[in-house]
Amino acid sequence: MQSDDIIWDVINKNFCSFKTTFNKTKFCKNEYNVTGVCNKVSCPLANSRYATVREEEGVCYLYMKTVERAHTPNRLWEKIKLDPNFMKAIEQIDSHLEFWPGHMSHRVKQRYIRITQYLIRMRKMRKQIKRELVPIKKKAERRDATRENKALIAAHLTTNIKKELLERLNKGTYADMHYFPEDIINNVLEKEGEADQFSEEEADENEEEGEEEMEEEFEDDIDDIEDAGGAFEYVEGDDDEDDIDDEYENEPYQDDDEEDDDDDDDDDEEVKPQITKKRGPTFKPTKKTPQKRVHMEVEIEEETENQAN
């Protein structure tokens, strides 16, 4: 015959494998404990009549222990599946614990409420989107990058080969060596020619637009200068040459005979040729200086060779 008082005295005063203490409070680790507190009322070992609720894979079960099954440990706990509906499960607990103590049925209901609450939270968390950390393989990334580069190079090669073959067909290097019908080749060549003409027309249009813009800018600059009261003055090169010739005519000319009279001792020596270099003078405009002017400088070098007779 089981004696609850003797069992509790042994467990309370001596060792119990399920008993733990935290902050001077005793707790029970037994899976059938209703409250989790280590005391005589909540201890599943020291009570011959006991009931609790357990959750297994999201399903709640009601466990009951009676004195009649104390001699069969494998059949000690009666297992009853509770309905997933909360109200129906409460009715099941009330019906099975109708003649049990009130505090026992109340604690079982409290435990069932806590279990249903954390099951609801678990369902909500499963529905939420979670971030997964995926490991990145550097070797695989490098391999993919090299493959992409090779594919790009191959694509460029194919386009260049295509252009080269079309150019050779246009030039007629293959003549009648190809195995394709002439209609297809002519169509391809016509399409390529149209594309080239279109590109050439676009280039010509761009050049014409650029020339027109340059002319417009030049005309705008001229208009601005005329508005400011200035004028262009160009200096021609022919007039400069005439002026330089006049200067040389006005300068006195020394003859080789006069030099021989001055130097009496050097009669037998030959007179070396003299090379005269003169830089042409720069002419400044007489009119008022405009804002923009064109300056031209002319340099003329003349060599005169005079030999003594």
UniProtKB/Swiss-Prot annotation:
Transmembrane segments: none annotated. GO terms for cellular component: nucleolus; preribosome, large subunit precursor. The keyword Cytoplasm does not apply. Gene3D superfamilies: 3.30.390.110. Keywords: Nucleus. It is found in: Nucleus, Nucleolus. The keyword Membrane does not apply. Belongs to the MAK16 family. Residues 195-227, 235-270, 299-309 have a biased composition (Acidic residues). The lineage of its organism: Eukaryota, Amoebozoa, Evosea, Eumycetozoa, Dictyostelia. The gene is mak16l. Residues 194-309 are annotated as: Disordered. Pfam families: Mak16, Ribosomal_L28e. Residues 275-293 have a biased composition (Basic residues). InterPro entries: Mak16 (IPR006958), Ribosomal_eL28/Mak16 (IPR029004). This is Protein MAK16 homolog. It comes from Dictyostelium discoideum.
